From Swiss-Prot:
Keyword presence, Transmembrane helix: yes
Residue stretches spanning the membrane: 5-25, 43-63, 68-88, 89-109, 116-136, 160-180, 210-230, 238-258, 259-279, 286-306
Periplasmic domain ranges by topology: 26-42, 137-159, 231-237, 280-285
Subunit and interaction comment: The complex is composed of two ATP-binding proteins (LsrA), two transmembrane proteins (LsrC and LsrD) and a solute-binding protein (LsrB).
Database matches in PANTHER family: ABC TRANSPORTER PERMEASE PROTEIN YPHD-RELATED-RELATED, AUTOINDUCER 2 IMPORT SYSTEM PERMEASE PROTEIN LSRD
This protein's encoding gene: lsrD
GO annotation, cellular component aspect: plasma membrane
Residue ranges, Cytoplasmic side: 1-4, 64-67, 110-115, 181-209, 307-330
UniProt key word DNA-binding: no
Name listed for the protein in its UniProt record: Autoinducer 2 import system permease protein LsrD
Location within or outside the cell: Cell inner membrane
Source organism of this protein record: Escherichia coli O157:H7
UniProt cross-references to InterPro entries, sorted A to Z: ABC_transp_permease
Length: 330
């Protein structure tokens, strides 16, 4: 517990240093309104990264969420284009996202194949389905499906009490998933499954039901992100989630989750989402090309993960150094 919270505090300190450093280059980075409203450009990544954290803590992984976002986005556009009332279209889109997650869970549970392989397959399945729907609707290129009601397109651009709506939804998701993972018996089951699925099964923990809930929640979060993105951009496109994969997984790992399962923290992921998002924005405001900013993001991930590994194993490192000092090589 102490180490985990220490890691989260270190991430928070790094976030402050990052903002101040970019603020020294461009003072706009220190403007509170800019910091709040610029989150709308990347906070949907966080909405997906939160349940993805729970999936990874359970020892699984889902890399299909980007395609799920694209499929849900274009499905929302097709439903609206077909004359379905907007509230019903949104509800059906959310159900579609949850269904995509359940498909992942069902295939993983009943085939016993590695989740990475299964979700790689569904990534292409959902992406292909999105392109098929897009072609059937006549939406080509970057145009997508438009013409949504103004009340819908304004939703993701509104603010409540000075906070943008996407950020508010992210904070609600943060509270829900934090309570679920860290304050409930079901959350403790997630950690146990990640540490040893066989022991969890012998302990009468509903492993399959838990995995279904986790993957369905990731699919549902992807659908929520899709609805927000369509509202934000005013267009439903099949490629809306194409760039989400690496930032989301980076945020989860950077936030402290063990990629092999058994440990992780929702708060850490939330801070890491802001860290990665503001890093990209700060580099863009500093005039750094996208290719360089992507490389720097990867370098940051490597440095921080190595630093965390050292902090978690510092006692073993001290013992190894002591042995080397007492038994120097000839």
């Amino acid at each position: 517990m102490r180490i985990r919270y220490g890691w989260e505090l270190a991430l928070a300190a790094l976030l402050v240093i990052e903002i101040v450093s970019f603020g020294a280059i461009n003072p706009r980075m220190l403007d509170l309104n800019m910091l709040l409203f610029s989150t709308s450009d990347f906070i949907c990544i966080g909405i997906v990264a939160l349940p993805l954290t729970m999936v990874i803590v359970s020892g699984g992984i889902d890399i299909s969420f980007g395609s799920t976002i694209g499929l849900c986005a274009i499905a929302l556009g097709v439903l609206f284009q077909s004359g379905v009332p907007m509230p019903l279209a949104i509800l059906l889109t959310l159900l579609l996202g949850a269904l995509c997650g359940l498909i992942n869970a069902g295939l993983i549970i009943y085939t016993k194949v590695n989740p990475l392989v299964i979700t790689l397959g569904t990534l292409y399945l959902f992406a292909g389905s999105a392109l098929l729907l897009s072609g059937m609707a006549g939406a080509t290129g970057y145009e997508g499906i438009g013409g949504f009601p103004m009340a819908f397109t304004d939703f993701a651009n509104l603010d409540v009490l000075g906070l943008p709506v996407p950020l508010i939804i992210f904070l609600i998701c943060l509270l829900v998933f934090w309570l679920w993972l860290h304050k409930t018996h079901a959350g403790r089951n997630v950690f146990l499954i990640g540490q040893s699925p066989r022991v969890a099964l012998y302990s009468a923990i509903p492993v399959n039901r838990t995995l279904c809930a986790l993957y369905a929640m990731t699919g549902l979060a992807s659908a929520v992100a899709a609805v927000l993105l369509v509202s934000y951009f005013g267009s439903a496109r099949s490629d809306l989630g194409a760039s989400f994969l690496m930032p989301a997984i980076t945020a989860v790992v950077l936030g402290g989750a063990n990629i092999y399962g058994g440990s992780g923290a929702i708060i850490g992921t939330a801070i890491a989402v802001l860290l990665v998002g503001y890093l990209q924005q700060g580099l863009q405001m500093a005039g750094v090309p996208n290719q360089v900013s992507s490389a720097l993001s990867g370098a940051l991930l490597i440095v921080v993960v190595v630093g965390r590994s050292v902090s978690l194993h510092r006692q073993q490192i001290k013992e190894w150094l002591a042995r080397r000092a007492n038994n120097p090589l000839p």
